[in-house]
């Protein structure tokens, strides 16, 4: 059985926060899709609270579509230390870093949580705008690196 790409990453050596280009996949018709690791918190040291992470997911899923072209999906990591971002095309990590930082600035300006109703969300009661803003501010203050080892 082939090991999942993210399981090959030595989580004890990385230094969050960072933006990591994980892979570029080639479709059968020549299209490309790029997967990114948007790591906000240090693995095995910190983790998001669920309401804050869920809120940040809603906000970033909305704002990243304004700041980056070709967004397919933003998904929370099960370990609750960051998100996976999937984009059409072969996209540069620096472009994603800039778009992510712009989206996080929009999070700080937000006064309403998008898709916060039972119709729009499967767990709408577990959303925290306050918590999402706290994490956004913290990660912007620290700054995202393009070097996963923090050098």
From Swiss-Prot:
Signal sequence bounds: none
Chemical reaction(s) catalysed: S-(5-deoxy-D-ribos-5-yl)-L-homocysteine = (S)-4,5-dihydroxypentane-2,3-dione + L-homocysteine
Protein purpose: Involved in the synthesis of autoinducer 2 (AI-2) which is secreted by bacteria and is used to communicate both the cell density and the metabolic potential of the environment. The regulation of gene expression in response to changes in cell density is called quorum sensing. Catalyzes the transformation of S-ribosylhomocysteine (RHC) to homocysteine (HC) and 4,5-dihydroxy-2,3-pentadione (DPD).
Family according to the record: Belongs to the LuxS family.
Presence of the UniProt keyword Metal-binding in the record: yes
Entry-linked NCBIfam families: PRK02260.2-4 (NF002606)
GO biological process: quorum sensing
Highest taxon in the source lineage: Bacteria
Stored InterPro entries: LuxS_sf, Metalloenz_LuxS/M16, S-ribosylhomocysteinase
Subunit structure comment from the entry: Homodimer.
GO molecular function: iron ion binding; S-ribosylhomocysteine lyase activity
Cofactor: Fe cation
One Pfam family in the UniProt entry: LuxS
Keyword annotations from UniProtKB, A to Z: Autoinducer synthesis, Iron, Lyase, Metal-binding, Quorum sensing
EC category: lyase
Residues the record lists as binding Fe cation: 54, 58, 121
Organism whose genome encodes this protein: Clostridioides difficile (strain 630)
Protein name: S-ribosylhomocysteine lyase
Cofactor note: Binds 1 Fe cation per subunit.
Presence of the UniProt keyword Metal-binding in the record: yes
Enzyme Commission number: 4.4.1.21
